[in-house]
Amino acid sequence: MANVSIRKYKTSDYETARFLFAEGTKEHLPAACMYTLTTPRFYFITFVAFTSVFMGTGSYVLALTSLVALLAAGWYGLYSEFHGLASRFLRKDMLDIEKSYMMSENACFWVAEIDGKVVGTVGAQPSTDADDELLLQRISVARDYRQLRIGTKLCQTVIDFARQRGFNAVCLETANIQRAATNLYERVGFKKSRVEILPSLVHQYTSFTVAYYRYNIKS
């Protein structure tokens, strides 16, 4: 079995850490598309679109063309959402990882390494909502290494850090389409605290939800 080591971020990890996070975010696009295709709202909208065009034109070809256009617009909307999300974070805390995570005693960034190769990342920062909570974020594991329990090790690293720094809980958020991530967090011991539908048009159309999880640290 591969020897996985978790260590603190170094400046030389910069490009790899950003790449892993961005790719991990964008790869949720297929799952998002499949999820959207199963929602009642999708069937309702496509039915209304097809029926309206057919009733207005009497043409099956135009009605089907309208469905293709609707699907293309939906795909582009999801594509823009996930690629835009990755870009926004790359321009925020991931733009200067050293400054965002390594210059405060209550924040940190780690990488998972196998044979000198960085294959995973995770960051932790104090919550802006509560002084006793630490946020787990920017967790990502390279696709070819996801059967090695690296995600579990990264989560546990953040939990241990929070305990050492005197925090009472570790919190995080994840989308409902991220099934593997949700299973990981629940397996580690995180408990779901609430679920929200974000106000953006894409989230309203697709019924995507964001779940908030909390891990209470025992004293």
UniProtKB/Swiss-Prot annotation:
Mind telling me which Pfam families this protein's record contains? Acetyltransf_1
Q: Which GO terms of type biological process are on file?
A: gastrulation with mouth forming second; negative regulation of cell adhesion
The kind of enzyme this is, by top-level EC class, is transferase
Q: Which GO terms describe its cellular component?
A: Golgi apparatus; Golgi membrane
| EC number(s) given by UniProt | 2.3.1.-
Membrane topology designation? Multi-pass membrane protein
Task: Cite the N-acetyltransferase domain residue spans from the record.
Answer: 62-211
Transmembrane stretches in the record are: 44-64, 66-86
SUPFAM superfamilies per the record? Acyl-CoA N-acyltransferases (Nat)
Which keywords annotate this record? Answer: Acyltransferase, Developmental protein, Gastrulation, Golgi apparatus, Membrane, Transferase, Transmembrane, Transmembrane helix
Which molecular function GO terms apply here?
N-acetyltransferase activity
Q: Which domain of life is it from?
A: Eukaryota
Compartment list: Golgi apparatus membrane
Q: What does this protein do?
A: Plays a role in regulation of gastrulation, possibly by controlled reduction of cell adhesion in the periblastopore region which is necessary for optimal cell motility.
Sequence similarity? Belongs to the camello family.
What's the protein called, per UniProt? Probable N-acetyltransferase camello
- UniProt source species: Xenopus tropicalis (Western clawed frog)
